[in-house]
């Protein structure tokens, strides 16, 4: 084969590989918040948002390896949930330009102060629950999500009245947190 053709084929393969490796979004997960909400509304599903630090957070890596990256989780979750990855890697080249721009805004919007944080939204985009790493594998994690979501409406009945009791409101922490510091 001609040397020029070999070099051209090698360059094409490298560009294709670079384009494919440009994202840290796992198979079966979206990285676009608006697209996830639209899909959830259209399919009447909850959105599971994984706020992760994929290249530096040990607990995030464990959650991914033990739960989210498994076929059992992806198959079980696909029936009930829209999966959204909001990654905050130190190596920003792992993100698409859109994710690099939007992910810090989502971390702030959802007041994420530590990683991993898993936020579940209903099909209307309202927060239902939040959690993080849970040991036990994909079956146990899916069961925990199902149970928390099932009981969330009952729990909210009691939490909302308490929130404004005695003229007070829960204060969200302010200042620079570890999560926000990691994004800068």
Predicted regions and their residues:
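Loop/turn elements at helix/coil->beta-strand transitions in domains of secreted/extracellular proteins
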Residues: 43-47, 79-85, 113-116, 123-126
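Bacterial N-terminal signal peptides
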Residues: 8-18
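Thiol-based oxidoreductase modules, predominantly thioredoxin-like and allied folds used
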Residues: 27-30, 52-53, 66-101, 115
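Bacterial Sec-dependent signal peptides at the C-terminal "C-region" and cleavage site
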Residues: 17-27
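Non-catalytic, surface beta->alpha helical segment in thiol-disulfide oxidoreductase systems
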Residues: 66-68, 105-154
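Thiol-/selenol-based redox modules, centered on thioredoxin-like
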Residues: 134-184
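Local sequence-structure signature of Cys/Sec-based thiol-disulfide redox active-site neighborhoods
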Residues: 31-73
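Bacterial N-terminal signal peptides that target proteins for export
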Residues: 1-9
């Amino acid at each position: 084969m001609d040397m020029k053709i070999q070099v051209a084929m090698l360059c094409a393969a490298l560009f294709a590989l670079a384009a494919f490796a440009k994202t840290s979004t796992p198979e079966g997960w979206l990285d676009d918040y608006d697209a996830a909400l639209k899909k959830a509304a259209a399919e009447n599903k909850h959105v599971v948002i994984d706020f992760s630090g994929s290249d530096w957070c040990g607990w995030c890596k464990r959650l991914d390896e033990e739960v989210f990256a498994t076929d059992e989780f992806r198959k079980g979750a696909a029936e009930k949930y829209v999966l959204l990855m909001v990654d905050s890697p130190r190596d920003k080249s792992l993100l698409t330009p859109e994710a690099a721009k939007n992910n810090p805004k989502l971390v702030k919007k959802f007041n994420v102060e530590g990683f991993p944080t898993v936020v579940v939204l209903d099909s209307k985009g309202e927060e239902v629950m939040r959690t993080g790493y849970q040991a036990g594998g994909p079956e146990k994690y899916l069961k925990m999500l199902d149970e928390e979501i099932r009981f969330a409406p009952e729990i909210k009945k009691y939490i909302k009245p308490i929130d404004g009791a005695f003229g007070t409101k829960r204060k969200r922490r302010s200042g620079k947190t570890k999560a926000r510091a990691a994004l800068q």
